[in-house]
């Protein structure tokens, strides 16, 4: 499901730059996803937990390549590290689609802890209300379910009109055992 969603986003916005944070879909993408052009896929999901990287990196990508749509893929946990930076995208009117995968916590970290038999502690922070956050930023918020076509439609809805937040609220990227 993770790669199917990444493929749907790529196909919905060809030539885009997809920037990622340390999230399960990005880790899966690093293994199984092919972007449509060199330099169009980059992230900090290299095993060192660089949470908070995605939002400012997407802003940099949008400034560096204004002719390309930018999609930022970040989890709800990672978004909390740099969420105020979305206001920079607002101030600069950057056409970035911030895709926030809201699985109610640090699922990548929790899964890793479970895999090695460590008690899962500190992996369930309460996420902000991203619809209210988008409203306070003065940008659109779109909710999407776990259907790749619905997610593709959501990311194109406000394309080219400044930043927006697309929140995936269903556990689309949850491990199979969840």
Q: What does each model-identified segment do?
A:
Residues 1-61:
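Active-site diphosphate/adenylate-binding microenvironment
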Residues 13-16, 37-40, 65-70, 92-97, ...:
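Short coil/turn connectors at secondary-structure junctions
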Residues 26-27, 49-51, 79-80, 104-108, ...:
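Short gly/pro/ser/thr-enriched loop/turn and capping motifs at secondary-structure boundaries
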Residues 62, 88, 133:
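Hydrophobic/aromatic ligand-binding patch that stacks against planar heteroaromatic rings
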Residues 67-154:
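Conserved thiamine diphosphate
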Residues 148-178:
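Glycine/aspartate-rich loop-and-adjacent alpha/beta segment that forms the canonical ThDP
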């Amino acid at each position: 499901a993770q790669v199917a969603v990444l493929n749907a986003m790529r196909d919905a916005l060809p030539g885009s730059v997809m920037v990622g944070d340390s999230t399960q879909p990005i880790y899966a993408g690093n293994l199984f996803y092919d972007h449509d052009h060199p330099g169009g896929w980059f992230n900090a999901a290299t095993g060192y937990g660089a949470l908070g990287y995605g939002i400012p990196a997407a802003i940099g990508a949008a400034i560096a390549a204004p002719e390309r749509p930018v999609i930022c893929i970040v989890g709800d946990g990672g978004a909390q590290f740099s969420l105020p930076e979305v206001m920079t995208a607002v101030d600069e009117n950057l056409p970035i689609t911030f895709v926030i995968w809201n699985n109610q916590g640090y699922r990548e970290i929790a899964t890793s802890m479970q895999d090695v038999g460590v008690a899962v502690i500190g992996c369930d922070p309460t996420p902000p209300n991203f619809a209210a956050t988008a409203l306070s930023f003065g940008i659109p918020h779109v909710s999407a379910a776990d259907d790749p076509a619905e997610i593709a439609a959501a990311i194109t809805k406000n394309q080219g009109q400044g930043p927006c937040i697309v929140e995936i609220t269903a556990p689309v990227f949850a491990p199979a055992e969840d």
